Swiss-Prot record:
Residues forming coiled coils: none
GO BP terms in the entry: tRNA pseudouridine synthesis
GO molecular function: pseudouridine synthase activity; RNA binding; tRNA pseudouridine synthase activity
Taxonomy of the source species: Eukaryota, Metazoa, Chordata, Craniata, Vertebrata
Keyword Cytoplasm on entry: no
Segments crossing the lipid bilayer: none
Protein name: tRNA pseudouridine synthase-like 1
Length: 298
């Protein structure tokens, strides 16, 4: 008989406003993490033992995820085959209600697959609404973008963003008091660009001069709040408060005490968009093997 224990890679999204972040927190806290709710929902599937999710990418309080990932081991009672991927998603989403957390899909992976360690890259998108203050922002955009009063000089932003590309010491974009100060500040930024975007249901209402922009960043990993600091600095360039040359100088000076701390974008405009893996690692179980397990449920 096949083992009833299985490792799954789960794809999930969440509206991060009401959570302390994605990582679990002590249950005595008034505000919990997304992981707390995932594990409570999984325990309702009546597994053998305690469920533990291993999150691919950490997000802070107020930050959202279009798609985050985690791996989880689920063992069922003796004689019961592992959940099919479809049933796992359906059951988890049922038990997650009414939380704004949803499983998108699940994939059976090999027992040595690790959602965080095996990730090749992570992509974040930061949404900016230029042309209005936050009180003037359409209600549907509430905690989903950063509203700034004036327009942006996109040409200057593009010039500055190119300086961030490649491998650099990003000490200037980390907190001087960071708990992770022991981690290497050397990061390789594979993508840093800005593109026009649209708001929610914008074709149904007059947006005056409101313009939405997506700031997109991709790297294997980032420093704590690095994306929000890069976004804040680039917006400052677009507003004329910083120059592209100053961005280059900050990188070269490698000083975490520089005044970039005054240009940290708020959390509510940030989304984890995607996590990339080697596709061959996501094929731990063949279609034939999966069919064998599925047949036990019929």
């Amino acid at each position: 008989m096949h083992s009833s224990k299985a490792r799954y890679l789960v794809f999930f999204q969440y509206y991060g406003t009401k959570y302390s972040g994605v990582m679990e927190t002590p249950i005595t806290q008034s505000v919990l993490g997304v992981q707390n709710y995932l594990e409570v929902a999984a325990q309702k599937l009546r597994p053998v033992g305690t469920i533990k999710f291993f999150i691919s990418s950490r997000t802070d309080s107020g930050v959202h995820a279009i798609c985050n990932l985690a791996h989880v081991d689920i063992e069922r009672a003796k004689g019961k085959p592992p959940f099919t991927e479809e049933i796992l998603v359906q059951a988890m989403n049922h038990h997650l209600q009414p939380e704004p957390i949803r499983l998108l899909k699940a994939i059976r992976v090999c027992d040595n697959f690790h959602a965080r360690h095996n990730a090749l890259s992570r992509t974040y998108v930061y949404r900016v609404a230029a042309g209005c203050s936050r009180p003037e922002l359409p209600v549907f955009e509430g905690n989903l973008c950063w509203a700034i009063q004036d327009g942006l000089n996109v040409t200057a932003i593009n010039e500055a963003s190119k300086m961030l590309l490649g491998t650099h010491n990003f000490s200037a974009f980390r907190s001087a008091n960071s708990e992770n100060a022991f981690k290497s500040p050397i990061k390789t930024l594979q993508q840093a660009d800005i593109n026009p975007s649209c708001g929610i249901l914008t074709h149904h209402w007059q947006s005056r001069n409101l313009q939405f922009w997506d700031f997109t960043f991709r790297a294997r990993s980032f420093l704590y709040k690095q994306v929000r600091r890069m976004t804040g600095a680039l917006v400052a360039v677009g507003q004329g408060r910083l120059t592209p040359q100053q961005i280059k100088e900050f990188l070269e000076n490698q000083d975490p005490n520089c005044f970039l701390g005054n240009f940290v974008a708020p959390p509510h405009g940030l989304f984890l968009k995607d996590v990339e893996y080697d596709g061959t690692e996501l094929n731990g179980f063949s279609a034939e093997e999966t069919q064998k397990y599925s047949s036990h449920l019929n």
